[in-house]
């Protein structure tokens, strides 16, 4: 059984679009802010501050349905001394293998979980400890294909079905909070943790130490921090010292 509330893993996000490190507002590709033209250097910066893991998203891949920034991701994975998890455009067994062979520690499935559950089952059978499913939701309903396509699939229903297929870890993102510096959807995250009783990583709107403390208290295994560490709203080093 998953043990809750002991500590929380704080995971810096590196979102890559056009080879640059960017942040989007609520997942909108038309509302991007470029923070660095050197994603590898950014990864090394977060590692030097004490990051236990890096969360890398291939935004081009998420939109195109295939890995676009593979060479850059490979360079990050090979340069980092900490585990690197990757999402965005991972919709085939071939892409999963390619990323894991390249040194990626964990692959994250999003669209594939909705559109190809048989593939998820096959991936779990071979790489159960190296895969997570990202539940990306608007008003409790799952969005796919780079968050552009809305569905009527309930987030909790998807999580339950993926757990039955062998998924042992989930990432939950409330799209309306992502990139807003508001706050996470604590209620939805709490409900998901209670419903599936496996590790859940929270994402979207995490922007303060108090957010991280509350996420730890409700049982989140980890929290992905994005815009707040780029704007300076969240002091990453202090967060690691206080909560890791």
Curated annotation (Swiss-Prot):
InterPro entries: Aldolase_TIM, His_biosynth, HisA_bact_arch, Isoase_HisA-like, Isoase_HisA-like_bact, RibuloseP-bd_barrel
A Pfam family assignment: His_biosynth
EC id: 5.3.1.16
Example of a GO cellular component annotation carried by this entry: cytoplasm
Pathway participation: Amino-acid biosynthesis; L-histidine biosynthesis; L-histidine from 5-phospho-alpha-D-ribose 1-diphosphate: step 4/9
GO molecular function, one term: 1-(5-phosphoribosyl)-5-[(5-phosphoribosylamino)methylideneamino]imidazole-4-carboxamide isomerase activity
Superkingdom classification of source: Bacteria
Transmembrane intervals: none
Predominant localisation class: cytoplasm
CDD domains in UniProt: HisA
Residues of the active site: 15, 136
Keyword line: Amino-acid biosynthesis, Cytoplasm, Histidine biosynthesis, Isomerase
UniProt catalytic activity: 1-(5-phospho-beta-D-ribosyl)-5-[(5-phospho-beta-D-ribosylamino)methylideneamino]imidazole-4-carboxamide = 5-[(5-phospho-1-deoxy-D-ribulos-1-ylimino)methylamino]-1-(5-phospho-beta-D-ribosyl)imidazole-4-carboxamide
Subcellular location(s) of the protein: Cytoplasm
GO biological process: L-histidine biosynthetic process; L-tryptophan biosynthetic process
PANTHER family hit by this protein: 1-(5-PHOSPHORIBOSYL)-5-[(5-PHOSPHORIBOSYLAMINO)METHYLIDENEAMINO] IMIDAZOLE-4-CARBOXAMIDE ISOMERASE (PTHR43090:SF2)
Record-stated family: Belongs to the HisA/HisF family.
NCBIfam families: 1-(5-phosphoribosyl)-5-[(5-phosphoribosylamino)methylideneamino]imidazole-4-carboxamide isomerase, PRK13585.1
Full protein name: 1-(5-phosphoribosyl)-5-[(5-phosphoribosylamino)methylideneamino] imidazole-4-carboxamide isomerase
Gene this chain is encoded by: hisA
């Amino acid at each position: 059984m998953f043990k809750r509330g002991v500590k929380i893993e704080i995971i810096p996000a590196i979102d890559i679009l056009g080879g640059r490190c960017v942040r989007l507002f609520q997942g909108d590709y038309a509302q991007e802010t470029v923070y660095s033209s050197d994603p590898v250097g950014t990864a090394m910066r977060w590692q030097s501050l004490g990051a236990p893991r890096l969360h890398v998203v291939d935004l081009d891949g998420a939109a195109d349905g295939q890995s676009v920034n593979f060479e850059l991701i490979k360079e990050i994975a090979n340069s980092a001394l900490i585990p690197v998890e990757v999402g965005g455009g991972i919709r085939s067994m071939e892409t999963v293998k390619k990323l894991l062979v390249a040194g990626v520690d964990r692959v994250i499935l999003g669209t594939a979980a909705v559109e190809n559950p048989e593939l998820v089952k096959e991936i779990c059978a071979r790489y159960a400890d190296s895969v997570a499913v990202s539940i990306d939701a608007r008003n409790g309903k799952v969005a796919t294909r780079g968050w552009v396509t809305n569905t009527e699939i309930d987030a909790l229903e998807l999580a339950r079905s993926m757990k039955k297929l062998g998924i042992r870890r989930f990432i939950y993102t409330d799209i309306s909070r992502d990139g807003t510096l508001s706050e996470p959807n604590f209620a939805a995250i709490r409900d998901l943790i209670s419903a599936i009783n496996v590790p859940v990583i929270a994402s979207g709107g995490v922007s303060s130490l108090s957010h991280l403390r509350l996420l730890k208290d409700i049982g989140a295994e980890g929290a992905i921090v994005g815009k707040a560490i780029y704007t300076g709203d969240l002091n990453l080093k202090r967060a690691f010292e206080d909560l890791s």
